[in-house]
Amino acid sequence: MRTVAAALLLALSLTPALAQDAKIGRQKAQACMVCHGQNGLSTQPDAPNLAGQPAMYISNALKAYRSGDRRHEMMAMMAQTLSDDDIQNVAAWFSSIRIEAHLPR
């Protein structure tokens, strides 16, 4: 029982940090929004929507662009400007955006 209580306390203590990371990420993601949209929904036909994507997916993609393991000229240049903390914060921001899907009838 103590283990469960300790885990719950730890999880609750991390929540404000995650919210703050997303807030910082939103500020850092201003350049991203030119192509990926203010709300994470792309304004460019060749740029994917980032709203609601898992943070790990976004983080891994940015790190791969930065290292050259994944190739795209613009994304490589953008990722080069981001620190590891920046990448985590940007990923937290885009993953925190909630989207709603409507299925066709």
Regions found by a protein language model. Give the residues of each.
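Bacterial N-terminal signal peptides
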Residues: 5-13
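Gly/Gly-Pro-rich "capping" loops immediately C-terminal to redox-active cysteine motifs
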Residues: 26, 40-70, 76-81
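Electrostatic cytochrome c docking/interface patches
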Residues: 12-29, 42-46, 59, 98-105
